[in-house]
């Protein structure tokens, strides 16, 4: 292996390792210290495919890479190009074919209703979204998402504001709770429930359903059912004269302005048959004690700490500026990511030499099929990335590349990666000798203490 090629491999692996305090980063010769020239120009050279924040640095991507490429002469969408710099100028390591793994809610159709709206990302918008579907919903103060149920289970994360949820369990137990930003709810398939915005600006949340074919327009609605049931039957069911039901809606209400709710205690039905549910349908995700990493924080919610959530597991990540969610993969489910804040790039390795890099920003959805290796790198040196990793699974599972190599016999690792350079192999194995998992790795400064291999 030639020295420049060896150094590309060596320094690339080191950048992804982002060592703990006691570890020393791998170093390389100063002549390969970093990229040369202005990004996206014919003279730009970067043998290591470093990140470029086109949006933050106000750069216009062009398909130039290490002496290859040419300018663009035809029609262009410059805003989209800035949002997707790694599609315009892919890293040299990208190769082969891969279906699209990115969708923006900004491209989804919005259904506008009285005091609210909804939009969705399903397998119809993003064909790789096979296991999960997402719905972004907004309810103003007092606005109700009417009483309904689904074929699928519903998991939700509150993005802003406060919301009141109601639900009924299979034992006839009632659940009512007021939730706020950073909290979750989960309704098992078929369980009836409702939602209502509470705070002055209402609420906005992300809904997740455990089937990529889900459609928000195909839910079972109270008003829709009664509008399509003979009033004589309704009267018999509720033991009330048919005339009482002449005032009910003739079609579904779906999202509508409701009356102002009182306190939960004031709203509890007073009938003798009322009982509280023994199930906990809500969870305070952001109140969890975080997993602290060198480059951020992680909170994991699954059936181990939110028992009712049998089909959806999730991780909330805060990735600090310049930091990276380490190279890893998930063995039990596809990853469905929702980016809440910041800008990031993700390279997905699909085996057989196939890899592709996608860029994400707030409001984007990303898919990584199960077992495909990937990372999430914060493109910005100033702004954190906040992202949800969501899975159709009862438990969150992942494998860390760093931990795997750190706990594999050193001889085996060196035989795989550094057979032609024992010195490089020694440096690498020293860097991974503490195999403790570091889920989000802080940015490493490779400009210090340069050494020749």
Where are these regions (language model features)?
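Fungal secretory targeting signals
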Residues: 1-21
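A short, N-terminal "cap"/entry segment at the start of jelly-roll beta-barrel domains
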Residues: 18-133, 233-316, 320, 326, ...
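Structural signal for hydrophobic/aromatic residues that build the beta-strand cores
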Residues: 139, 158-165, 182-187, 195, ...
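Glycine- and acidic-residue-biased ligand/ion/polar-headgroup-sensing regions
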Residues: 141-144, 149-171, 321-324, 329-352, ...
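Intrinsically disordered, low-complexity regions enriched in proline, serine, glycine
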Residues: 147-149, 166-168, 175-176, 207, ...
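Active-site-adjacent segment of 2-oxoglutarate/Fe(II) JmjC oxygenases
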Residues: 202-261, 384-441
């Amino acid at each position: 292996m030639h020295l420049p090629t060896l150094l590309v491999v060596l320094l690339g692996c080191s950048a992804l390792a982002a060592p703990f305090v006691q570890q020393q980063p791998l170093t390389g010769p100063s002549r390969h210290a970093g990229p040369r020239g202005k990004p996206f120009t014919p003279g730009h050279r970067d043998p290591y495919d470093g990140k470029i924040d086109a949006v933050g640095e106000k750069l216009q991507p062009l398909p130039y890479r290490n002496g290859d490429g040419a300018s663009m002469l035809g029609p262009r969408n410059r805003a989209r190009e800035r949002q997707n710099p790694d599609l315009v100028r892919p890293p040299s390591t990208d190769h082969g074919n891969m279906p699209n793994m990115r969708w923006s809610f900004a491209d989804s159709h919005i259904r506008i209703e009285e005091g609210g709206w909804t939009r969705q990302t399903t397998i119809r918008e993003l064909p790789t979204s096979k296991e999960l579907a997402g719905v972004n919903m907004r309810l103003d103060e007092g606005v109700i998402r009417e009483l309904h149920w689904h074929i699928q289970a519903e998991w939700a994360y509150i993005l802003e504001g406060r919301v009141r949820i109601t639900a009924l369990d299979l034992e006839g137990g009632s659940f009512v709770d007021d939730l706020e930003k950073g909290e979750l709810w989960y309704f098992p398939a078929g369980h009836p429930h409702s939602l209502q915005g509470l705070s002055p600006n209402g609420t906005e949340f992300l809904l997740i359903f455990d089937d990529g074919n889900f459609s928000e327009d195909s839910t079972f609605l109270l008003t829709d059912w009664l509008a399509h049931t003979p009033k004589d039957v309704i009267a018999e069911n509720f033991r009330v004269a048919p005339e009482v039901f002449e005032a009910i809606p003739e079609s579904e209400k779906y999202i509508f302005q409701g009356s102002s709710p009182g306190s939960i205690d004031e709203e509890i039905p007073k009938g003798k048959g009322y009982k509280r549910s023994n199930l906990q349908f809500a969870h305070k995700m952001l109140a969890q004690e975080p997993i602290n990493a060198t480059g951020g924080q992680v909170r994991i919610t699954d059936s181990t700490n939110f028992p009712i959530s049998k089909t959806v597991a999730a991780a909330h990540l805060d990735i600090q500026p310049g930091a990276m969610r380490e190279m890893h993969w998930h063995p039990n489910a596809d990853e469905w990511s929702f980016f809440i804040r910041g800008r990031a790039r993700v390279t997905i390795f699909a085996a057989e030499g196939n890899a592709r890099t996608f860029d994400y920003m707030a409001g984007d959805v990303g898919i990584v099929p199960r077992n495909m290796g990937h990372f999430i790198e914060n493109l910005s040196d100033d702004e954190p990335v906040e992202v949800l990793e969501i899975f159709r699974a009862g438990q969150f599972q992942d494998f860390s590349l760093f931990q795997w190599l750190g706990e594999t016999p050193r001889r085996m690792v060196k035989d795989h990666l550094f057979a032609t350079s024992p010195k490089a192999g020694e440096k690498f194995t020293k860097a991974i000798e503490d195999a403790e998992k570091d889920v989000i790795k802080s940015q490493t400064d490779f400009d210090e203490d340069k050494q020749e291999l």
